[in-house]
Amino acid sequence: MKPSIILYKTLPDDLLHRLEAHFTVTQVPNLHPETVARHAQAFASAQGLLGASETVNRALLEKMPALRAASTISVGYDNVEVDALTARKIVLMHTPAVLTETVADTVMALMLATARRVVDVAERVKAGEWTESIGPAWFGVDVHHKTLGIVGMGRIGMALAQRAHFGFTMPVLYHARRRHQEAEDRFNARYCDLDTLLQEADFVCVILPLTTETRHLFGTTQFARMKSSAIFINAGRGPVVDENALIAALQNGEIYAAGLDVFEHEPLSVDSPLLNMSNVVAVPHIGSATHETRYNMMACAVDNLIDALQGKIEKNCVNPQAAG
């Protein structure tokens, strides 16, 4: 008899068939309490859980006594109570490697769009404001040869450093929990403390997960330390930044512009002052959102769950100690 799993994400047919070859699959639209209650027997017997974005907490786990593995279609897992899973000996799998290059492309796009004011001037053209040769009011700033500061030198930080160093001849500074020798050797990246990075970088790019240590890491003090010409990019997690402090820094001219893929509360409220600022490029958490990469993430998550329920957790496991 096949193990049973709960699937709370729509998958392409080929990936669904791959799951069905190994498991009895119950598909649900979400993990809301009413959904769990409606499918109580399926949740109670499920050994696996696969999906994205929904909250996985102790209350849900109480309804899933047979659960052995959860697989998220994401690299981040701040919506999952990992400690609760680990206490129950439930492994959590994620998809870190397959989205690296795509997210780095997104960060680079935000850097270029903010520096060259691509969104702002495109909207002005559409509004019929281009009636003569453009002047300084339409100008942006250069990207090449400017200093890039990366906060969080993981896989995505490395991919961004590669683009900046080789493609745009940018000196690279970085701040991370530990030195990254490969970044220093390949890209001549310079490790520094956060204050030094903020004071010297022309672009400050944040690529951090959300933890208790990183929540509101960027606030009034940090923005005040940045150059008034600096461009701030956040492609990690929204709550790493105190959004009110960022808004104030932009309104007061403490920094030049911001490119934001993530926000403290998502979706971003239509009333947010950020949406009324011409020097802000705001996109809806599109970091990995290409057809190719999202498919690869789903395929990776499917394979992760198959492996985990066969006792194979050598890669992509957040909490391998749970299997001990």
From Swiss-Prot:
GO molecular function, one term: NAD binding
InterPro entries: D-isomer_2-hydroxyacid_DH, D-isomer_2_OHA_DH_cat_dom, D-isomer_DH_CS, D-isomer_DH_NAD-bd, Glyo/OHPyrv_Rdtase_B, NAD(P)-bd_dom_sf
Keyword Nucleotide-binding in annotation: no
Entry EC no(s): 1.1.1.79, 1.1.1.81
GO (cellular component) term, any one: plasma membrane
Alphabetically ordered keywords of this record: Cytoplasm, NAD, NADP, Oxidoreductase
Catalytic machinery residues: 237, 266, 285 (proton donor)
Pfam families: 2-Hacid_dh, 2-Hacid_dh_C
Keyword Aminoacyl-tRNA synthetase: no
Reactions the enzyme catalyzes: glycolate + NADP(+) = glyoxylate + NADPH + H(+); (R)-glycerate + NAD(+) = 3-hydroxypyruvate + NADH + H(+); (R)-glycerate + NADP(+) = 3-hydroxypyruvate + NADPH + H(+)
Subcellular location: Cytoplasm
Main location: cytoplasm
HAMAP family for the chain: 2_Hacid_dh_C_GhrB
Record's subunit section: Homodimer.
PANTHER family for the chain: 2-HYDROXYACID DEHYDROGENASE-RELATED (PTHR10996), GLYOXYLATE_HYDROXYPYRUVATE REDUCTASE B (PTHR10996:SF283)
Family of this protein: Belongs to the D-isomer specific 2-hydroxyacid dehydrogenase family. GhrB subfamily.
Entries under NCBIfam families matching the protein: PRK15409.1 (NF011938)
Described function: Catalyzes the NADPH-dependent reduction of glyoxylate and hydroxypyruvate into glycolate and glycerate, respectively.
Name listed for the protein in its UniProt record: Glyoxylate/hydroxypyruvate reductase B
Organism of this sequence: Salmonella paratyphi A (strain AKU_12601)
